[in-house]
Structures are given as structure tokens and as C-alpha cells.
Curated annotation (Swiss-Prot):
The keyword Ribosomal protein does not apply. It comes from the Bacteria. The keyword Cytoplasm does not apply. Na(+)/H(+) antiporter that extrudes sodium in exchange for external protons. Belongs to the NhaB Na(+)/H(+) (TC 2.A.34) antiporter family. Its main location: membrane. Keywords: Antiport, Cell inner membrane, Cell membrane, Ion transport, Membrane, Sodium, Sodium transport, Transmembrane, Transmembrane helix, Transport. Pfam families: NhaB. The gene is nhaB. This is Na(+)/H(+) antiporter NhaB. HAMAP family: NhaB.
């Protein structure tokens, strides 16, 4: 059936997104200029922020780059902010963009080593409780130094690989489509497959939460951490130590939750790896190990050495994070024999869409700054006592981060806190405590929904999710015990431990106060 030009344009607009979503975005684009010119720029600015958060919350309907980008382009076009202000925001956060471009691509070339590690963990640890703890710890450690998306991508690769192997064997190799269970006609095999799915679901959730537990601890664990660290003038060690009063109790309690939900089979956890599946996977791994050539073994050794360089370079702050990532790309590709341009290009595919989206974030942040949108909220919070300010910043960040992207939320709040410090509203010591509250508030409660954690959203939209029956609702349900414990322990840490522990660490000489010159914080 022929369609009109108008219908063709509507079908092309935002692709396969639902019609109601397309109409909503078009409505935003029509209403925003009218409100800006005829009602109030302040109201129009807040409408833009809410609309942008809406596009982030609806990420499963349409990747936020397109609708959010259209809103940002219009905001610049009608004068909500200027191209110069947007360029300034991007320049201020160039380190973060380099982190995403080079570090994520660098870790892509270390995937063989990471796959090897997680495969050995899964097959060699027979206790499900210990295995869950190992996955959580491994994900936390890796996410403290690497990109959380890459870590979760590796765990997804392991899980999809194992699922494919077992599915093909149990369907007698007759069913090449692993999404189709019709080739499995045995009831026992169906039950075993369901148990295997439950087993993989729980492991993926433990790994996902592990990325949050480790990611909050270091300045490279999450993109917003680097923005916060730069604003406060902290290096890698400073950031890690300053976060410890909150992150260490949360980390310990997070691991306890991991043990308890597995031991008592709560919230969908506790499923064991079926023995039949273990036999199939072990046989496959033994065959793969036997076929591994000396060249492939040397690649694993080289990648392990590069991993040590990565940790040392970050811990000792030998170079900017993005440049360390670039060095990983050069070393890994040189010594693993990857010299084809097409092969190099694949490494950048994962990070560039999010890098583009982050640039759109900065355009919206420019609007927030230009229109002073958060000034009333910040003034309200800063009227409270210093200790109450910390809890309020933590809670406001946590609430927004659980429904929106935590990079966006963290960027907005650290900019406002920095502005309050520069205008003499808060002291330097209080600003640094607020930076800790903002970082932990942005990272910890955001595990509540896939919208808050990029790693969770990546898992939900991956090829693995439908295979193991991991829906949005099930993900929220399985994350609930972690959400409650991490949020509450984090709040208690901010309220009762942060100030006395920071004072003790300062007196002990573990941390020093930076001085600020020309608007940039520089550590002593």
C-alpha cells in the first residue's frame, strides 16, 4: 500500500519508536519555543530538563541521543544557551570524553584475558554462594579500574557463549536458533534449561551490582566520578581515600547481601548450575584449552602485563586517564598483532554512541548554567546545617539517579556545589564533603533501575536478556535488596562517618586540602 510523503516522514522520524513517543517528542519541540519566548525562559529551561530526563528514562523505546539531541539543538537555536557555552562545557570535560573513547576501546583489546578469567571462575568454583561472591568481587575490582560497560559486556559474552553451547547440545544440534526452544522436546531438559537460565540471571545481577560497588570507589570507575574528581582537584589516590568512609561500609554490606540472598534463595537468587550443564561446559573448555596455540597463550600473558601497567598508571597518576587508555590500545594491538584498520575500528563502536550522548548532556548542562535552573534547589539545600546539606545532596542525587542517567545528574550537582564554593557560600572543606556525598549519592541508589546504571541498561538491551528471561521488572525486583542496603548504608555513612573519618584521615596525613587557582582545583 502506498503511503503519503507525510506518513513516510513520520515513519522515518525516530525509526521504530512507538507513535506516542514520537508525538511526545514533537510536542516538546513545538511547546518549548513558545514557553521560552512568551512565558518564561526559566520555566522553559526546567521543561527541557524534565523532557531530557524523560528521554533517558525511555531509553528502551529509543536511544536518548536522537530525541535528547533534537531538544538540545533547539535549545541552542532559540537562545536558551550559546554554542560558546556548550563548547566551554565540553572543553571542561574533555578528560571524560577521552576516557570513554580510549579507555573503553583499550579494554576491548583485553577481552580475551577477561573472558578467560570469568570462564575459569565459573567452571572451577562449585559452590554457588562462593561463585556469586567471586563474580561480584571480580566485577567490583575490574570496574574500579576499567569501564563498567566493558566488564559487564565480557560477563555477557561468557554467559551467551555458555548458553549457546548447552542449548545446541541439548537440542541435539538441530536448532541453530538459540532463541527457539522447540528443538528441546524432553521435559527434564526443559527444566534443566530453566534452572540454567535462573543461574545465569543471578550471576549477571551479582556482576552488575559488583560494577556499581567497585565503580563508586575510584575516579575512573564511572564517567561522572572523573568530572567530580576534576572539580575537586583530586588525583586517583585522593579520590579513593576520600570515598572510603562511605564506600567501604557499603562494599562490605553489598557483599553480605550477595551471600545472604544466595544462601536463603531470596529475590530470585540461589539457583545452582545443573550438573548436566557443568559437564557439557567443562568438556567444551577442555577442548578449547587443548586447541589453544602458543601464540594465543602469549596474547593472554601480554594482556595480563598490560593490565598491571593500567592499574599502576592509574594509581600513580602517571598520565591523564584517556592517555593511559590510548597507551593500552597501542600496547595491546602492537603485541597481539592487530594492525588492520577495520579491526581497530570495532573497538570504538561500543563507546562512541555514549560519548555523543554525553556531549548532548553537556549542552543541557550549559542550559542549566545559563538559566540558573538549579539555583533555587541549591539555595534551599544550603540553608540547612552543614551535616544536613550532605544528606540532602546524597538523597536528591540518589532520587534523580535512580530514574535518570547518573552522569547527567552528577555533572549538574557538582557544578552547582562548585559554584556555591566559588561564591563563598560554602567552605572548601564543606565543598569536598559535598563532592563525596554527590559521588556516592549518584552511584549507589542508581542500582534501583536499569535507567540509572549504564551497565544495567546495557545488560537489559543485550542479546542475553531475552535468552535468560531477564525483563525490566525482574531486574528491578532482583536489584531491590541491593538497592535498599546500599542506599541506607550509604546515607548512614554520609550522615555519621564522613565528617569524623575525613578529619581523622586529614590529621593522619592521608589526605590534604587542595588550593584553588583560576577556577581549577590543584592538589598540594
Amino acid at each position: 500500500m502506498d503511503i503519503t510523503n507525510r506518513q513516510a516522514v513520520l515513519k522515518n522520524f525516530l525509526g521504530n519508536s512507538p507513535d506516542w513517543y514520537k508525538l511526545a517528542i514533537m510536542g516538546f519541540l513545538i511547546i518549548n519555543p513558545l514557553v521560552f519566548f512568551f512565558v518564561s525562559p526559566f520555566v522553559a529551561g526546567w521543561m527541557l530538563v524534565i523532557e531530557f530526563i524523560f528521554t533517558l528514562a525511555m531509553a528502551l523505546k529509543c536511544y536518548p541521543l536522537q530525541p535528547g539531541g533534537l531538544l538540545a539543538i533547539q535549545a541552542v537555536a532559540i537562545g536558551m544557551t550559546s554554542p560558546h557555552q556548550v563548547a566551554e562545557e565540553i572543553a571542561n570535560n574533555l578528560e571524560v570524553l577521552l576516557l570513554l573513547v580510549f579507555m573503553v576501546a583499550g579494554i576491548y583489546f583485553m577481552k580475551q584475558l577477561l573472558l578467560f578469567v570469568f570462564t575459569k571462575l565459573l567452571l572451577n568454583i562449585r559452590s554457588k554462594t562462593i561463585l556469586s561472591l567471586a563474580f561480584c568481587l571480580a566485577s567490583a575490582f575490574l570496574s574500579a579500574f576499567l569501564d563498567a560497560l566493558t566488564v559487564i559486556a565480557v560477563v555477557i559474552s561468557v554467559s551467551v557463549g555458555f548458553y549457546t553451547i548447552y542449548h545446541n547440545v541439548t537440542s541435539n544440534h538441530s536448532d541453530k536458533d538459540i532463541t527457539d526452544d522447540s528443538g528441546i522436546d524432553n521435559q527434564d531438559s526443559h527444566e534443566t534449561l530453566e534452572q540454567f537460565r535462573a543461574f545465569l540471571r543471578s550471576l549477571m545481577m551479582h556482576a552488575g551490582v559488583g560494577t556499581a560497588l567497585g565503580g563508586v570507589m575510584t575516579m575512573v570507575g564511572e564517567p561522572q566520578n572523573l568530572i567530580i574528581a576534576k572539580s575537586a582537584g583530586w588525583n586517583f589516590a585522593d579520590f579513593f581515600i576520600r570515598m572510603l568512609p562511605v564506600t567501604l561500609p557499603v562494599f562490605i554490606c553489598g557483599l553480605l547481601v550477595c551471600l545472604l540472598v544466595e544462601k536463603f534463595k531470596l529475590f530470585g537468587y540461589g539457583a545452582q548450575l545443573p550438573e548436566r550443564v557443568r559437564q557439557v561446559l567443562t568438556e567444551y573448555d577442555q577442548q578449547a584449552s587443548a586447541k589453544r596455540t602458543k601464540q594465543e597463550k602469549m596474547k593472554l600473558i601480554v594482556q595480563a602485563i598490560i593490565g598491571v601497567w593500567l592499574v599502576l598508571a592509574l594509581a600513580l597518576h602517571l598520565a591523564e586517564v584517556g592517555l593511559v587508555g590510548l597507551s593500552v590500545i597501542i600496547l595491546a594491538t602492537s603485541f597481539c598483532g592487530i594492525t588492520n584498520e577495520h579491526s581497530l575500528g570495532k573497538a570504538f563502536q561500543e563507546a562512541l554512541p555514549f560519548t555523543a550522548l554525553l556531549t548532548v548532556f553537556f549542552a543541557v548542562v550549559a542550559v542549566i548554567i545559563e538559566q540558573s535552573l538549579f539555583t533555587p534547589i541549591i539555595q534551599f539545600v544550603l540553608q540547612a546545617s552543614p551535616s544536613a546539606q550532605l544528606s540532602l545532596f546524597y538523597l536528591f542525587n540518589g532520587l534523580l539517579s535512580s530514574v535518570s542517567d547518573n552522569v547527567f545528574v552528577g555533572t549538574v550537582y557538582i557544578n552547582e556545589a562548585r559554584s556555591a564554593f566559588e561564591h563563598g557560600i560554602v567552605s572548601l572543606q564543606q565543598f569536598e564533603l559535598l563532592a563525596v556525598a554527590i559521588n556516592t549519592g549518584t552511584n549507589l541508589p542508581s542500582v534501583a533501575t536499569p535507567n540509572g546504571q549504564a551497565a544495567f541498561l546495557f545488560l537489559l538491551t543485550s542479546a542475553l536478556a531475552p535468552l535468560i528471561r531477564l525483563s525490566y521488572g525482574r531486574m528491578v525486583y532482583m536489584a531491590l535488596p541491593y538497592t535498599l542496603v546500599m542506599t541506607i548504608v550509604g546515607l548512614l555513612g554520609v550522615e555519621f562517618l564522613l565528617v569524623p573519618m575525613t578529619e581523622w584521615l586529614t590529621q593522619a596525613g592521608w589526605i590534604s586540602l587542595p588550593h584553588i587557582t583560576n577556577g581549577v582545583a590543584i592538589p598540594h
